[in-house]
Design a protein with these regions (language model features):
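Acceptor/aglycone-binding surface of glycosyltransferases and processive sugar-polymer synthases
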Residues: 68-83, 88, 100-180, 206-227
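Short beta-strand/loop segment that forms part of the nucleotide-sugar
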Residues: 27, 31, 38-49, 66, ...
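A conserved acidic beta->alpha catalytic loop
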Residues: 47-55, 96
Length: 391
């Protein structure tokens, strides 16, 4: 235990919910590391409401217990991190699947200036039976690959439970998630925030519990995937939306001049209606991606930028949105008025329904796109007012 005059360098934080079977050995390994290495540190057990006496076991083995009433993996860890007194924090599960006596690689990288040091179980070795095949061959590799692609992260194992970080750097990220997706949030926000990130090989042993783990494969896997997608508007909204918008718009315009025949397949009014709907959905998705990215960048998240987007952001405003939207709306309205006078010229009699509907769909589409653009410009104006006030 550090004396009252010693500055604590390392806090080893373990989330805990009924870990009486394995908690003692985890704490002993952590204490052994601190004693052997000479690192001035502490062991913190962030207890999430254990009813099996885990708190008493932790105190008996020299750990500091922090009661965290808010349930969840992320909640427990943030409670422990907030209470930590060390410059650095190493966090890991209290189920004896990670070896807390071998933390030298993490501490070395942290002392070298890295702000997040991730363990990589696939490089260090996974003991037989330590990880379900679904997680080993599908869940972890696929989700980690998605994370690397979406956020250009160098991390190969997004969900390793053993990781170290500079405490203040992580607190500055303002982490929010309370469940298992906390593991992904740390990596994603560290990457977007420009933190110095690295990884070291680590091992994963079969945990020592006789009960099932807290992890729920499909539920928690979905939470990880959902978080990754929400923080990547480019892949979730922009690219799919742009594809839908251009396909729908081109199809709508072509059919407005007459049916399209491809072999034995004909595309006419009914196809045009669906293509117009696809255009509207795609356009809304693109607008949402742009607004989301602008908001995220104003909030300090370092989402990868591009020159084209920077130029677009400078040109987008309430006024420009209103002008472009009004122009689209008026063009659509003009087509509708022209169609009305054409009908009047026929004495308000019967018209070719196919040709009439094709023109009406195009006019309605332009009016809807115009209205959406005006509303997006107004929302951006409100957003900018709110951001300026926050500053």
């Amino acid at each position: 235990m550090p004396t009252s005059t010693e500055t604590i360098e390392l806090s080893i934080v373990m989330p805990c919910l009924n870990e009486a079977e394995t908690l003692a050995v985890c704490i002993d390994k952590a204490q052994d590391y601190l004693e052997r290495s000479g690192v001035v540190g502490e062991v913190i057990i962030a207890d999430n409401g254990s009813t099996d006496g885990s708190q008493d076991i932790a105190r008996a083995h020299g750990a500091r217990v922090i009661d965290v009433p808010a349930r969840g993996y992320g909640s427990a860890l943030m409670g422990g991190i907030d209470a930590a007194r060390g410059q650095y924090v190493v966090m890991g599960d209290a189920d004896d699947s990670y070896d807390f006596s071998k933390l030298d690689p993490f501490v070395e990288r942290l002392r070298a200036g890295d702000e997040l040091v991730m363990g990589n179980r696939f490089k260090g070795g996974i003991a037989e039976g330590a990880m379900p095949p679904l997680h080993k061959y599908l869940g972890n590799p696929v989700l980690s690959w998605i994370g690397r692609v979406l956020f250009r992260s160098p991390i190969g194992d997004f969900h390793c439970g053993l990781r170290g970080f500079n405490r203040q750097s992580i607190i500055n990220l303002h982490l929010q998630t309370t469940g298992m997706e906390f593991a992904s949030e740390v990596v994603v926000k560290s990457t977007l925030g420009g933190l110095r990130v690295s990884e070291v090989p680590t091992t994963l042993d079969k945990d020592g519990r006789s009960r099932p783990p807290h992890l729920r494969s499909w539920r928690d896997g979905w939470r990880h995937l959902r978080f990754l997608l929400i923080f990547s508007p480019r892949w979730l909204f922009l690219i799919p939306g742009a594809v839908a918008f251009f396909l729908g718009l081109i199809g709508t315009l072509f059919i407005s001049f007459g049916p399209i025949i491809l072999g034995d397949i004909g595309f006419d009014v009914s196809s045009q209606v669906y293509l117009a709907a696809l255009t509207v959905v795609g356009y809304q998705s693109v607008l949402f991606a742009i607004l989301t990215k602008i908001y995220a960048q104003h909030e300090g998240f370092r989402i990868p930028r591009s020159r084209n987007f920077d130029r677009l952001e400078r040109r987008i405003s309430l006024e420009s949105g209103a002008l472009v939207g009004l122009a689209l709306f008026l063009v659509g309205l003009a087509i509708g008025i022209w169609q009305f006078f054409a009908w009047a010229g026929e004495g308000f009699g019967s018209l070719d329904p196919s040709g009439t509907v094709r023109t009406a769909v195009l006019a309605a589409l332009l009016m809807m796109l115009g209205a959406q653009t005006i509303m997006a410009g107004m929302f951006l104006g409100v957003l900018n007012v709110g951001l300026k006030r926050d500053r």
